[in-house]
Amino acid sequence: MWYNNILETIGNTPMVRLNKITKDIPATVLAKIETTNPGNSIKDRMALKMIEDAEKSGKLKPGGTIIEGTSGNTGMGLAIAAVIKGYKCIFTSTDKQSKEKFDALRAFGAEVIVCPTNVDPEDPRSYYSVSSRLEREVPNSWKPNQYDNLSNSQAHYEQTGPEIWEQTEGKITHLVAGVGTGGTISGIARYLKEKNPAIQVLGVDTYGSVFKKYKETGIFDKNEVYPYITEGIGEDFLPKNVDFSLIDHFEKVTDKDAALMTREIARKEGIFAGNSTGSAVAGLLQMKDRFKEGDLVVIVFPDHGSRYMGKMYNEDWLRDRGFLKDEKLTARHIIEKKENQQIVTIDCEKTVLEAINTIKSLNISQIPVTQKGMVIGKITESDILNSLIENPSIKSHPVKEIMTGPFPFVDLNTSIDKISAMINKDNIAVLIEANGQIEIITQYDVINAISA
């Protein structure tokens, strides 16, 4: 079986039981893992739906430009669809969003304009206002307006809700989801409550957002609004996609609890999820008294952790905000968590062909080069390939002729953040001398240690 294009792979995401992190909850808790969508987030669903509906209505014309205010995930969904359908994209976002999100959008050819966070939505500098101005100024442009475009929630009514109902065989008793634009929770809730009105829908909000108080009092209180760090949930206004009548309860979660829980999910469940997932799980645990044995709780995991490597998965970032005590993961921890595999080296007088055979037989991508037991350089797959292209006879030459500078050495107390920063396209590993032996740490080892 194959698909005609990447857009056809959107949806039908897996449901995974949570075990360790929910051990104090008597109910069965299932995570709806939306990171398997092509853009690694749930927003792919509604991005495609908004575009398709705009095409049908004539609002989005061939060769047009899509302009949207987005924190990254909706932009990714729109950008992927735009590539396939032949549109251009201009996105506005806030300066609190992670750099990884902006880099990902630009990778798909989108233009990204970064705006200040701490201004009112009506301020001409806000990312809402800038996107609206661009819509007026750019010819043949269309603004999806994910907050008020009801195609957003309709996507989840048509797709995500039915998937959850079928995957749980109609046994779901509670839905837990973060609330940002409101499309995800409202669309799913509408479908599920049509199937079973007794299903409880629990929204997770953040401090600095207006949702919880508005639900409980009917009052839009601007005093509730203040800057917050959590990404993907909460707002300082009321999007039309938030259907408060379908949400039975809002639970607020602090920035700190959300950030730390994001990391805990990776370490306890092996799921590399984003910041709003941390909020949702922290909210779930705060609400544990609502659940009893026999209940089946579905919690939405909206996006992937790769977009938060510079934030929630960065210990220095957490420590700078007072979220983390000074308990750094170090090179020592990485070595302890590695499989007991002895490092492979090659003497500088060995031939390039011998290096090729070693790399192939051991399925590795790099080898430290030694001379009389001392590390003096390295040889990688790309070094070999580039040399062979220039001179095919190089295979019979000694490795020292094509080796490059050695991988950098670090000590056992070097933090995982510093190691991560040192591993790049030029240095795909670092070396450690421990107990008279040389150890190698790759990006895979770093990820494995973080997730352990």
Specify the residue positions occupied by each region the protein language model found.
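PLP-dependent amino-acid enzyme catalytic core
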Residues: M1-H333
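The conserved cystathionine-beta-synthase
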Residues: V344-N363, V369-Q371, L388, P408-N427, ...
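Bateman (tandem CBS) regulatory domains
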Residues: L246, K328-I343, S396-F407
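Short hydrophobic beta-strand motif reused across regulatory alpha/beta modules
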Residues: T370, G377-I384, E439-V446
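Residue-level signal for well-ordered, solvent-exposed loop/turn and beta-edge residues enriched
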Residues: K59, M374, G436-Q437
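Structural motif
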Residues: E68-G69, T92, C115, G178, ...
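A short, polar/charged loop-to-alpha-helix boundary motif
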Residues: D383-K400, V446-A452
